[in-house]
Regions:
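Residues forming the flavin
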Residues: 2-51, 55-146, 150-167, 171-221, ...
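Short Gly/Ser/Thr- and charged-rich N-terminal loops/segments
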Residues: 224-228, 232
């Protein structure tokens, strides 16, 4: 017999399956042999903290090994090909969905596989430099593989988020992510899951090419209107029939390959060379809002005390505390982003002359610090205020009427370079005590930090653009009043957080998912401006795969 129950219980009863079973026996008189947690969330609004659970209790029978039907893949070795550029979550989920639909994915990834990539990340601290093709942004798994593995998304409108979580579980993630209100795999476990997804792609006839960088799209300018799928958008007789790519051999880009087929473009939000190529080729893009700011790091026990209303912090039974903060300052949103409880701050640059920070947490979330991005909203209409960040010469000559829409990208680059200069041209990060940042003074010394390459004292309040620093300072003051102890000299402001999302959107039709002027090109995921995190990128990847399948299978 299976009982489904809604429980509101103390943390010590909700700690694990055995403690829940003990609670059911002692408090409910249900002699369950096993339980399945369907939903789990923590209510810490009052001093007495409760855990809300929806559980299935199994009495006299065993629970199934998987709580969903596993997804079935079939051999596609001899099926028509679709090129997937990028092996982040958008690209990987697109590839798996293509296999389900009977098409062969050819995945082209500029970076290395997830194991080799980890070695390059480890070299950042001792060498104080970043490999431009293998870093926290580029490589198998994309930016999400080594930046926390959070699977929480507010978007429920664009696709089936449960499918994404189930596919992760099928490839080795814990089934707990199906129940948690804020599911999280962890940077220590997600790479193995990503590797298993690649193995599935290869096992069923797909291809994966690492250290292979797209350098151009192959465009057929002949008319498409004589046959095939009727065009509902202005493709001007142009369609994508493949890509040109170069292969890295012995540390040099040398061998040039062509891959033929329609293209799912899932290159991520840091592939700036792709944005410039599209603009120079007259392939329409437009400005998109994003947010820029800093990473704020507190001692984890302090955040636990604040969020759990208890001097003892989280104690034995609770996880490291999370927070989510948002306010408006002079008409623009200021908010926390990618909060990493019990985590650490990492160097997230993807090229030379850059210092960028991000955050991550291992699955246990048991580190000494907790950190979060603290960012200020920038809207497309704010672009005129950024006129002191001129475009590079290469953009002045581009054919696209949207060339000005690369201006926010230039703002990112200029701020990242300024951060690098402040860091003495190394991967150390400019930093300031939180109270000094708010008061407008240089810190005489700095707190300990999880940031491995090291910190250097810097007046971020001075060199950050005023429309960012002023809003952050006002928000910090407000949140310090709302959460006693939050505004403290024990916290550290670390620069700079610029990679919250893509600075542009690659324009596509909402129904066909194809670019508005070129058939056979499917802009996808966070880099194209249609997702914001692992799960939403995975959902968008699946939608693009379905659209690409419709396009391929309907053509003569």
């Amino acid at each position: 017999m299976v009982h489904e129950l809604n429980l509101r219980i103390l943390p010590q009863w909700a700690y694990n399956e055995q403690s829940i079973i003990a609670y059911l026996r002692q408090e409910k008189g249900i002699n369950a042999g096993a339980v399945r947690v369907l939903r789990r969330s923590i209510d810490a609004r009052q001093r007495t903290i409760y855990v809300n659970l929806t559980v299935q209790a199994y009495v006299g029978e065993e629970p199934p090994q998987l709580y969903f039907e596993p997804y079935i893949y079939k051999d596609v070795s001899d099926r028509p090909s679709v090129i997937v550029v990028g092996a982040g979550p958008g690209g990987l989920f697109a590839a798996l969905r293509l296999i389900e639909l009977g098409l062969k994915p050819i995945v082209v990834e500029r970076g290395k596989d997830v194991r080799e990539r980890k070695k390059d990340l480890a070299r950042i601290r001792p060498e104080q430099r970043v490999d431009p093709e293998s870093n926290y942004s580029f490589g198998e798994g994309g930016a999400g593989a080594y930046s926390d593995g959070k699977l929480y998304t507010r978007s429920k409108k664009r696709g089936n988020t449960d499918r994404i979580l189930q596919i992760f579980v099928q490839h080795g993630a814990s089934q707990a992510i199906l129940a948690d209100a804020h599911p999280h795999i962890g940077t220590d476990r997600l790479p193995r899951v990503i590797e298993n997804m690649r193995k599935t792609i290869l096992a069923y006839g797909g291809e994966v090419h690492f250290q292979t960088k797209m350098t151009g799209l192959i465009i057929d300018h002949s008319s498409l209107r004589s046959g095939g799928t009727p065009l509902t958008i202005d493709h001007c007789g142009k369609r994508i029939i493949g890509i040109v790519a170069k292969k890295m051999v012995n540390g040099q880009w040398s061998i040039v390959n062509e891959f033929k087929g329609p293209v799912i473009l899932a290159t991520g939000h840091s592939a700036r060379d792709v944005y410039r190529y599209l603009a120079a080729s007259g392939i329409d893009i437009e400005a998109k809002g994003l947010a820029i700011g800093v990473r704020l790091e507190h001692p984890a026990h302090l955040i636990d005390q604040i969020q759990y209303h208890c001097r003892e912090g989280r104690g034995r039974w609770l996880p490291a505390a999370e927070y989510s903060l948002v306010t408006q300052v002079q008409g623009r949103g200021v908010y926390s982003f990618c909060m990493c409880p019990g985590g650490f701050v990492v160097p997230a640059a993807s090229g030379p002359e850059q210092v960028v920070v991000n955050g991550m947490s291992p699955s246990g979330r048991n580190g000494r610090w907790s950190n979060s991005g603290m960012v200020v909203e920038i809207r497309p209409e704010d672009l005129q205020a950024l006129s002191n960040f001129p475009s590079k010469g290469e953009e002045k000559d581009c054919k696209s009427p949207f060339k000005e829409d690369l201006r926010v990208l230039r703002l990112q680059e200029e701020l990242e370079r300024q951060c690098w200069l402040q860091a003495n041209r190394l991967q150390t990060a400019p930093a300031q005590r939180m109270t000094d940042f708010v008061s407008g003074r240089l810190s005489a010394d700095l707190n300990e930090s999880s940031y491995a390459p090291g910190l250097i004292a810097s007046p971020l309040h001075f060199w950050l653009p005023d429309f960012i620093s002023m809003r952050l300072r006002e928000a910090f003051k407000l949140w310090g009043k709302q959460k006693r102890g939050f505004l403290t000299s024990e916290a550290t402001v670390i620069g700079i957080e610029t990679r919250t999302s893509s600075p542009v959107r690659i324009l596509r039709d909402s129904e066909t998912m194809q670019h508005i002027r070129i058939a056979g090109l499917f802009p996808c995921g966070e880099g194209a401006g249609y997702a914001g995190g692992i799960v939403s990128a995975g959902v968008d990847g699946e939608r693009c795969a379905e659209a690409a399948a419709t396009y391929v299978l309907s053509r003569p």
